[in-house]
Amino acid sequence: MAFSGIYKLDDGKPYLNNCFPARNLLRVPEEGQGHWLVVQKGNLKKKPKGLVGAQAERRESLKATSFEFKGKKESRRENQVDLPGHILDQAFLLKHHCVRKPSDLCTINAKENDFKHFHSVIYINASENLLPLEAFHTFPALKELDLAFNGIKTIYVKYGDFKLLEFLDLSFNSLTVEAICDLGILPHLRVLLLTGNGLTSLPPNLAVAEQEASVTSLTSKRYILRFPALETLMLDDNRLSNPSCFASLAGLRRLKKLSLDENRIIRIPYLQQVQLYDESVDWNGGRGSPHKEPQFMLQSKPRMLEDSDEQLDYTVLPMKKDVDRTEVVFSSYPGFSTSETTKICSLPPIFEILPVKSLKARNQTLAPPFPELRYLSLAYNKIAKEDAVLPVALFPSLCEFVFHNNPLVAHTRGVPPLLKSFLQERLGIHLIRRKIVKPKHHVLMSRKESWKVKSEIPKVPKQPLVLHHPRMTTTKSPSKDMLEPEAELAEDLPTTKSTSVESEMPTENLEGHSPSCRTFVPLPPICSNSTVHSEETLSHLSDTTVRLSPERPSDEDSKSTESIFLTQVSELPSSVIHKDDLELKEKDQKKPPTAPREVKGTRRKLPTAFLPSKYHGYEELLTAKPDPAFIEPKGIQKNAQALQQMLKHPLLCHSSKPKLDTLQKPYVHKEKRAQRIPIPPPKKTRAQLLDDIFIRLRDPRNITEAPLGAVLHQWTERRLVNHKQYLEAKRLLKEFQARYRQLVSGSLRTVFGTTPLPMACPALSESQPKFGHFLEFMDEFCQEPTASDSQG
């Protein structure tokens, strides 16, 4: 594999997101795009002598690079290395190695010492390869390195490698526990991604390592801090289940974000710093170390110890707002009091798991676990109890705690009460029990002027639906009094409002005309929107009317009279209406013509003789007036049922605060037992299905075949199921016995001509042995038909 320096595309812009290795899977394969270019920083005349000497040294080192070919070896050319404009493509490799076919080139060897001249490479993406971490240690300015999906198992890193590396992605590899410990010597590593490495445990000395015996003296022990600048650690999608992993991570002093999603963690343990009572113990914790180092130890100190001045010393002090909590104060921060130097932690950050009763409260000489941790995520784990999460209260800087998709919150609603009252309300820790769904990006569509619709659609006016009435015809009536009973009958009969109003209009319109010439206006049909039609009919008829006579009532008088309508006129039988009309006409003809009509006041009450039979007993409803203040309730039955339900089942709102003085019932998870799926029968072939169909067609359905002995002997066991078969078999057996006796008696009668002895005689076989042999013979062949059987 070949390597190069700063990479630029044809447009002159750097593409640092995916510059190693060069890929064109997600880009359009254009001419000249996706290749590696070696760009000179400037002319050789403007470069300093040191840089020119470095390039000359590189040129000499490249001369010694060997290239193996298939069957032959050739030396490479010197004048084609530093020439600008050379592209690492197929033509360059074929011309540079003097081969005709690409299959002739087997190996390209590029030394790692060549990378030290590329001072501007800060990011390398080498994921989905088979490259080790050690292949990139010679890049002097490398800050970000992505080595995901490389199958890395072990790591070999020395002091002085990757001095400026800050971001390292080793996701989805196969790292061992020892390989993770070897990464602790990187001095400036801030972000470490270890997702999907199949880790089952973490080393106990992950944060602190004991110095080798060859370096330390026999009278003192020294410890070296690991991961001095680590702030973000991703350990999700592993197999961590032991609570000791928290003890391994608690000593990381700069850790601010820790992700342990998709593991098998059950609880968080209570942690406390280990106290070492040996006076000779010393650790390289910074300026607060009480013991001085020997001179030979300073000389042999590795690169890691040279950067100890950058490590901050902290002091554990009680908080002013809450005495139960502690805060960490760093000596390098401004405003730090020098009078508190006696409380600086002089013990190595090694933590152990202790029960709650064994913790030493308010011990200011001990450092708290995770002193700077602000974000902790334990989603998709197996935490089922609230007590298993309470130890996060000992983390002094924790601000956000994520625990969604755990059994603790999977089967309940809301934040658990103990965590809400103690962690959220008292300590101010933000609890996240639900997965935060990221909002989707809004898609912005480009607006073109040609797409804009400029035409306006006129609004359709809202007009009521008008029904066309039949045309009016003029007819001659014999007298004026013949139409008055019709109007009175239309007012008295129970009809709709529109019908009652329209029935009065013909009588008003006919005033002023002679009795011999009047216009007849038929009533319009009854419809749902009767009010609209009545108003239109009134306006239509007002054009053809004349003045009202003083004898007729005015419009105000007609409106003042109100009526109650029980049903429509169309529901009455035509024979009843016709009969009532004739009776009313005869009654009006007998009245004197000078008698005035009384319209005002209460409406006339019809006699019971003129009402249909189904209205008998309801005459008072025709003259009663509704109460104007009465409001008819809607859905009174449902309201009554709802009121009864509320009275029987009152809603009691309990307090959301937990009752700490009472015993709480622990949550017991009920496992769902899935029913066993029955094993499906073997699939039959087409020939077997056809055979089954032919058998069903051939066998009669009214005959059931069963062995006689099985039915008779198994009746006691399957009495309820085969009781009918048992009775049928018993009847057939009796019939067979009777038939057998008839056969024997008939055969004996034809042979001897005399009446045989009864079958129950015990001395029959002894006195007449020939009859006994004959009976045995008949027992064997009783099923064969005989002539006597057919005659009988």
From Swiss-Prot:
Purpose: May be involved in the response of cells to X-ray radiation.
UniProt-listed InterPro entries: Leu-rich_rpt (IPR001611), Leu-rich_rpt_typical-subtyp (IPR003591), LRR_dom_sf (IPR032675)
Domain of life, per lineage: Eukaryota
Tissue: Expressed predominantly in testis followed by prostate and ovary. Low levels found in other tissues including peripheral blood leukocytes, spleen, thymus, small intestine and colon. Also expressed in neuroblastoma, glioma, breast, lung, leukemia, renal, ovarian, prostate and colorectal cancer cell lines.
Lineage, broadest ranks: Eukaryota, Metazoa, Chordata, Craniata, Vertebrata
Induction profile: By X-ray irradiation immediately after exposure and is then down-regulated two-fold in an X-ray radiation-resistant cell clone. Responds differently to X-ray radiation in clones of varying radiation responses.
Keyword terms: Coiled coil, Cytoplasm, Leucine-rich repeat, Nucleus, Repeat
Gene3D superfamilies: Ribonuclease Inhibitor
Organism field: Homo sapiens
Record-given protein name: X-ray radiation resistance-associated protein 1
Localization per record: Cytoplasm; Nucleus
Major localization listed first in the record, in broad terms: cytoplasm
Keyword Nucleotidyltransferase: no
Keyword Cytoplasm in annotation: yes
LRR repeats: 104-125, 141-155, 164-184, 188-209, 229-250, 254-275
Coiled-coil region list: 723-745
GO cellular component, one term: cytoplasm
Matching SMART domains: LRR_TYP
Bias (Basic and acidic residues) ranges: 549-560
Region (Disordered), start-end ranges: 490-517, 537-562, 577-601
One BP annotation, GO: response to X-ray
